[in-house]
């Protein structure tokens, strides 16, 4: 069976990335495959690290640099112009008799869905930390995503050549902020010439990279007796002691040996591999991707410590098989697909192949209707399809939109082309919401942030040649009921000679657990027992659809449950009529109950020199912000942790640069919704109506 995992970039229409792992089809080479993702906070050096891997593996002839716009994995025009990763990209390269399939993912919060999709396709991840910043906001987010997928991981502490880098602080952050068990395999040291070198804990060697050949070669020299060696031996003993408490094979050797010095390096590495695969520890390595230090040893660690596809103790182990050009596949939804071509990916370049075995990452051309989360198999048996879908289908967690705006084509003749472009972009990016507003007659986009919406507009122009117009960005408020309400809706009509009649009694109540329930009180239960399951489903669907648009600003109604008391459906009444009556009843209830607005709240991390902090805090106070903490950040800077309403943060990046004279930086991400006072609610309503 073959499981869809992630879709490639915008230029590969109908080309899809697959993760094929092996239990049924055992292949001898599958133990030499590593499917990995690379994750990080924005600007931690993730793409630079990937480019160095490609260079040292012989896949590229020159070093790709983000600031020069010549990277392999950041190939979109928008990525090269902005110097950020927007779409996940796949690259494949050999390293020391292994094959590494790597997915380079975005670090910006607006594109977190790209990370979520990519993690379905990998067996382990490398998390890159900025050695000068430690664990940052998006680091915590991607770490949580990896936790959800139970992925083994390595840490690469980057930028350790910089004078303000702090390795010990990074390790402390891993323990405190990520609540993990880091095991340091390397420690930073400066050579006599002041250049970054690495002391290896397991081998007790010093590793020094050569500038003259762009870091292609490095020297590993056994440390002579010295303070450095003594400290490193203590670190090695601590590593053995920690691993022996987690691995029985190593523990048996430790018990029988006279000294930790006698423990073989290969035995330590095998124990570390097992502990990493079981997610008991996280190996920590270091280097400087930009200065070409430490990358080869990072790739060695990927081969040594991250699992092969067949070693994952996950549902992926049950997927296996072979995919060939021209193969016919069936989705769990019963749709047939034909694989017209197969490609081995290198970002936006491809090498066509005839077939691939389980464990490989490939791009498929020709799939017309496959979307994120689909399961494809070669079987056409309904029972097997149903069982496969139940056991293995992916259910991506799509984040709520925080902004929305209208989108208009340049002319009526471009409307269909725009709709097709949006449909394709949604297949690639499920966090993009597209809806039709029946009141205004406009197509409405929902997205994760200002940058997200800007990129969508840019891609429609560059990839589909449609110069669309976006309306002003609006905040994606939500609504919740003020008080419970109960009403009965009775409707009778004759449509095309057929009598349609529905009478239903519904109630809305405060509830966060489920959207729709039955009132099984003694007086209502006999009536509810007469309703067929299909009618109950129709009533549920119609009722819930009305919660998508609240009465005040058209926001989604949340923290609300619809309770069905009774229903009487006339013979021959169409399902669509029943559904519409249920929706009208809920809309009537929402108007009767009244709703309160909930506004999106953002969590910010702001770093600035200490002398600028008071001015920044004063400005935040005017923005209805809640200051959670102010922490030291290095010798001269401080970090402000703050929650603030999204509505107050329009243009805040520019404001921060002005207040801090260009010395401040910030990151922000959604952290939930909060109720509003009546004054702010009135202002939000006026903004939604275009009066502000």
Swiss-Prot record:
One of its GO terms (molecular function) is GTPase activity. One of its GO terms (cellular component) is mitochondrion. Mitochondrial GTPase that mediates the disassembly of ribosomes from messenger RNA at the termination of mitochondrial protein biosynthesis. Not involved in the GTP-dependent ribosomal translocation step during translation elongation. SUPFAM superfamilies: EF-G C-terminal domain-like, P-loop containing nucleoside triphosphate hydrolases, Ribosomal protein S5 domain 2-like, Translation proteins. Keywords: GTP-binding, Mitochondrion, Nucleotide-binding, Protein biosynthesis, Transit peptide. This is Ribosome-releasing factor 2, mitochondrial. Residues 31-310 form the tr-type G domain. Pfam families: EFG_C, EFG_III, GTP_EFTU. The keyword Mitochondrion applies. It is found in: Mitochondrion. Its main location: mitochondrion. One of its GO terms (biological process) is mitochondrial translation. PROSITE patterns: G_TR_1 (PS00301), G_TR_2 (PS51722). Belongs to the TRAFAC class translation factor GTPase superfamily. Classic translation factor GTPase family. EF-G/EF-2 subfamily. Residues 1-29 form a transit peptide. The gene is mRRF2. GTP binds at residues 40-47, 104-108, 158-161.
